[in-house]
């Protein structure tokens, strides 16, 4: 798994910026403060395993990675049912935190689960092993569909994308690709904020 992480970094231009980034009430993040019924508030705290970034003079783009000991598949349906909101919450928090820190406009580039594993692969030729391992450890998540951002995350060749949940075609990306545009990613963040507020109100009413 460590080798695969190194390959992820080498294959792109994003660089690891911080590890185990804790955030909570003390950061005064609007996106982590949920206004509930009867004037109550709910604060969310957490720890982001790793954040990679790339930036220019005015903009900063973030890539969030959450390490998992077991395989975790990113599932839009679960998000809309309020069951798998962690990555989106983390991205909301990091975007607001780094806008405050840098004064730049901050955008989501990608959010991923990375399975910590050391797979055993069977290949005919030794030079195929590395690609097979990377494919077996391909991250699950959602990617900003902007081609330049995807290229910054992984420079690909004829072998296709080995680290990202993306399949390229002559006309863009095929339907198996987990991609959204920037507006859709921001909207996903708002949906999760609404779901968190609903969850907070349910907890207040004892509906668990």
Please provide the spans of the model-predicted regions.
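Structural signature of nuclease core domains in nucleic-acid processing machines
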Residues: 1-208
């Amino acid at each position: 798994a460590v080798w695969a992480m190194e390959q992820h970094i080498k294959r792109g231009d994003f660089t690891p910026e911080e590890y185990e980034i804790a955030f909570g009430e003390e950061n005064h993040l609007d996106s982590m403060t949920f206004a509930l019924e009867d004037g109550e508030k709910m604060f969310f705290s957490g720890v982001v395993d790793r954040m990679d970034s790339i930036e220019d003079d005015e903009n900063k783009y973030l890539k969030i990675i959450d390490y998992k000991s077991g395989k975790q598949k990113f599932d839009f349906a679960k998000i809309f049912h309020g069951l798998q909101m962690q990555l989106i919450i983390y991205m909301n928090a990091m975007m607001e935190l780094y806008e405050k820190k840098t004064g730049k406009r901050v955008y989501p580039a990608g959010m991923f689960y990375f399975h910590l594993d050391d797979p055993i692969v069977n290949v005919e030729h030794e030079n195929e092993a590395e690609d097979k391992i990377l494919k077996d450890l391909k991250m699950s998540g959602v990617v900003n569909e902007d081609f330049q951002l995807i290229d910054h995350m992984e420079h690909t060749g004829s072998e296709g994308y080995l680290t990202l949940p993306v399949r390229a075609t002559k006309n863009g990306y095929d339907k198996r690709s987990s991609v959204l545009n920037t507006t859709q990613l921001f909207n996903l963040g708002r949906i999760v904020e609404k779901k968190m507020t609903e969850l907070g109100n349910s907890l207040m009413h004892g509906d668990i």
